[in-house]
Amino acid sequence: MIKEVIVVEGRDDITAVKRAVDAEMIAVGGFGINSKVIKKIREAQKRQGVIVLTDPDYAGEKIRKYICNRVKGVKHAYISQEEGTKEDDIGVENAAPEAIIRALNLAKCEVKQERKEFDMNDMIFFKLTANEESKERREKLGMALGIGYCNTNQFIKRLNNFGITKEEFIKAIKDLDKGNE
């Protein structure tokens, strides 16, 4: 049983997560999220902690940000777009139990103090921007670090806000490069 309450978008997501783990869950109802649901999430966060696991698309990211702006200290779990896509449908409900377990094991909590550990120079040096393969490298690295896929500026923010260390980052880069050999 997972200690934290897992927050997902809908009932189909709950079904998929239940196939992977035993946990208490809250479905926000997509963009229908309201103050009652936010109150439930706040109470769960105080009581046992919360992990947000939304779809790997624009709408999922908007819902994640909405929750994060209203409930402090939640952890974030991410599945890749590849893991969440079945035919032309994208969502947590399409992810295999193994992908959901991996995402939950890598769940990260945002740190309070602002860090400047990573910047654009790191992105350029490690070919995470301004390179033909940068999008794919960011996606693979984001999954390995448990911070999900996003554009370069958001990637820098997540590296800093989720407390990723240079050591973790370098190890993940080396593993990524070994896998590409």
Curated annotation (Swiss-Prot):
It is found in: Cytoplasm. The keyword Protein transport does not apply. It catalyses: Endonucleolytic cleavage of RNA, removing 21 and 42 nucleotides, respectively, from the 5'- and 3'-termini of a 5S-rRNA precursor. Its cofactor is Mg(2+). InterPro entries: RNase_M5, RNase_M5_C, TOPRIM_dom, TOPRIM_RNase_M5-like. One of its GO terms (cellular component) is cytoplasm. It is an enzyme of class 3 (hydrolase). Keywords: Cytoplasm, Endonuclease, Hydrolase, Magnesium, Metal-binding, Nuclease, Ribosome biogenesis, RNA-binding, rRNA processing, rRNA-binding. Residues 3-86 form the Toprim domain. Binds two Mg(2+) per subunit. Mg(2+) 1 binds at residues 9, 55. The keyword Cytoplasm applies. It comes from the Bacteria. Its EC number is 3.1.26.8. CDD domains: TOPRIM_RNase_M5_like. Belongs to the ribonuclease M5 family. NCBIfam families: 5S_RNA_mat_M5. This is Ribonuclease M5.
